[in-house]
Amino acid sequence: MIDDFAALVDQQTYLSDYPYADTVELNVLIYGQKLRAAIGTTSGWPAAQTELMRALTDGPGMVVFKQAFGDLSVVDRATEAFLAQITAEKAAGVAGRDHFAKPGANDRVWGALDKLAVTEPAVFAEYYANDIIVLISESWLGPEYQVTSQVNVVNPGGQAQTAHRDYHLGFMDAVAAARFPAQVHRLSPALTLQGAVANCDMPVETGPTLYLPYSHQYEPGYLAFHLPEFTEYFQQNYTQLPLEKSNAAFFNPALFHGAGTNVSTTVRRMANLLQVSSPFGPAPWKPSTGSRCAGLSSRYCWKRKRPARPKAT
């Protein structure tokens, strides 16, 4: 088993196969100005989406967008709101914990998207009116997708998560996941797109997410990531990319990954973890009815602020 897995993750990513990417770093595709220029044209938007879908399936399974948010003040205001939410939840005794890390290592805001819509609707509208989120989400899932988010803060000294896969089978133990037939294991990743927005600068010492490119192609992976030999292989071969504030990484949920160890002494490394779900397979976490109603004014702003698609002339 491990030999088959190793053969898959030994694949290399070549920039020549991805004309809209700016570069390849540590086997991961990095997108920036070339993509920005392309998606402003009528033909470039769908062509870029086709390339991104290929990168997430046949390619490394992960892409990074430089300066996904052009206005850093929008990111800063969202960060302030998330930190205020963490403080409020701790004071109320309802602070969230990270299910893939030791208790106390990280801070979590579960359901961060709808909480932001309620507490800071203007910030919500500015933050999520983002063409890169639209581009990559529709590339993977098509229209009518649903976005949810959970904020994860790895505090100084916070230890790495164990390597895992995500929705939906990734949240089950091996016994539960084994009850589902093979075609469900193949289908599950197609129902969700995982993303992480860097809400602060993330040099390696702060513990940015660890990834294993091409690991999503291993079909038994939802069972294998529980096995110690796969955990050990991941720890010896992972990729860890530093990110700058406003960068965004998106990846196939079947990719083996986990937050890294924060060895810094002062930086609370904050990532806004996005789960973008197909209308045919919603995420287990759903925005509450009250939050959806309270966010109606933000939704109006979102539609007004959402970047226009290129139109034929």
Give the location of each predicted region.
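Long, low-complexity C-terminal extensions of enzymes
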Residues: 303-313
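Non-heme Fe(II) oxygenase catalytic core, chiefly the N-lobe of the double-stranded beta-helix
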Residues: 48-60, 68-245, 263-265, 276-299
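Gly/Ser/Thr-rich helix-start
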Residues: 62, 259
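Fe(II)/2-oxoglutarate
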Residues: 1-58
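ATP-grasp fold ATP-binding core
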Residues: 65
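Conserved metal-binding segment of the jelly-roll/cupin
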Residues: 242-257
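Ligand-binding loop in jelly-roll beta-barrel domains
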Residues: 260-271
